[in-house]
Amino acid sequence: MTPTEFQQLSTDLQSLVKIIPLNWGAVQNDSTDCQINMFKIDTFSELEQQIASLTEASKSYFRRRWFLWKNAQCDEYLFCLNKNVIQNPNAKDQSYDLEFNANSQLRFDVKGTIIPRGFRNKIEAVVKDPTEMIQFFYDNQSVGVRNKNQNRLFLVHHSFKNQEREMPLRCNWDFKKEVYEKYAEKITSNANFISYKEVKSDVIFLFENEDNSFTSNFFAV
């Protein structure tokens, strides 16, 4: 992704987030996915053209899915602005997204997400030790290539103001750029990663606070 492409895409996502629902409303499924080739769509305007004839439910589904997919690309772009972070050079290789410090032991699949409902009443404890939440993610979210688990870096978005603010939080690019830069500076192979099912993971918490400030928290580094 070039700087120009990032600028266009980040602007598109900030526009799109205003009209997409917080929740899916439908489970990801092949019958809906086959209606359009979402992975060939590069811009918000093109997406709207492709889904124009679909039902409102399908429109919401594709808007949300495309938003999350493209948001992940923007996250990876921001990480790769740091000299010690490189993107997987093989776009077809799904075993990892990013590598830190030219170290194959620091390869991670990057996963944007939120704090699950069952953990929201104990956020302070989760931030202090997210092990249980990480285990929940691995047990309940999609697994990696050929049903094998991958090292994962979870980007956990949470708004203390309103849960509906968690989607716009994903588009706070200036905030994220600073957070990812700090993380890239701190990560080492000696970090206290969470181990589960023979893989390792870490969490970057991205918070919007009640006073409108934004803060972050790292677990392993």
Question: What spans do the regions from the language model cover?
Answer:
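Nucleic-acid endonuclease domains
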Residues: 1-94, 112-221
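Active-site beta-strand-loop-beta-strand hairpin of nuclease catalytic cores
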Residues: 90, 99-111
